Amino acid sequence: MYPAHITRAEAAERSNQIAAHSYDITIDLSGRVPDAEPFDPTATFVSTTTARFSTTGGDAYLNLIADRVLAATLDGAPLSVEAFVDHKLWFAASAGEHEVTVSALCRYSRTGEGLHRFVDPVDDRVYCYSQFETADARRAFACFEQPDLKATFAFTVIA
């Protein structure tokens, strides 16, 4: 099985452990990231997500398909970027309400999955779009990627 996919058993276990509340997502298409190494803004973008949730406690993860995690925190305390393994950002949380913030370098899609970037050959303008199918949202931002973990979303786009 592709490592980014979760099994039915994993989804059932996480449904019993996590209740997702909200996501604040900033998609930065500008190519300007303060205090970070340069990257190719025609191929990649920076995604920053703050996920708010409650948990019964224990090890858990957010799903994210990204080139790499730039920074992550749990309730304001740093998480190691080494916790990002097989498209999952792992963390351990006690029972209660929590907040994970993760910034990542994500890759534009050329297939319509995740965030698609297209340069129109007629007007030479850049267009971005997404359908954010459940399984493809994780290509643009960190989330608890399964349909039964519903939450509200607030998006900010920097272009």
Predicted segments, located by residue:
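Acidic/His-enriched low-complexity segments
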Residues: 1-159
